[in-house]
Amino acid sequence: MSARLWRGPMGSQVLRRTALALFTICLLSLPALGNSGGPPYLNGDGNPTAEYGCSCHNNGQISDRAVVMVTGVPIQYATSEIYDFTIQVADSHTLAGDDGNTQAGFVITSGDVGTFTWQDDQELRIAEDSQGDVSHSETSDTGIWSLTWQAPAADEGDIHFWVAGNSVNGDGAPGDDDYWNMLSFTINAPGTIENDDNAATLETRTVSVGSY
């Protein structure tokens, strides 16, 4: 069977329609690809995603149904010290044992102060177009990731962190059944609390947002 080659005005029209259809498919695929492979540094409004949140899920509305939690956060940091963080993002309905979303993603930033690292099996990446923001590289079925943060070598004052987390239904497209929330916290500068005054300087804590 030989291939048929369209020529003339009709052929040009067919080619234009085919190209337009392929272009439209690509555009429709971008949101799903962008979210499943991790959010970009900037959201759809042109603001840092970690600090301003997601503008594509749940019509851009923040929701307490999305629980965002970070464990291993120190009260204050010691210069060059390494801290182990665990990040969890979940649907509060799922945490309560009810039907809810079971997949999740996130992005975290320290304002490029200190350094994040992680093991290869964590499916993390530097967020697209950012210097040091970290996000998931694949949507997680557990919603739990482990990474380390190394404090800067010099006293940089109090360091502020922001985390945006998505709890999603896994259908590959942003929608009303996907929920996101934002968490911010601060790690105090060295010497904020003297060791002799409060043993809490040696402890880490869990910080979270959302209803559960």
Q: Where do the model's predicted regions map?
A:
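Sequence context surrounding c-type heme c attachment/ligation sites in exported
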Residues: 29-150, 154-190
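Residue-level detector of functionally pivotal "anchor" positions at catalytic/ligand-binding pockets or at interdomain
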Residues: 189-211
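Secretory targeting signatures
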Residues: 1-34, 209
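A short beta-strand segment in extracellular, disulfide-stabilized domains
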Residues: 84-86, 209-212
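Short stretches within intrinsically disordered, low-complexity N-terminal or propeptide regions
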Residues: 5, 68, 129, 201-202
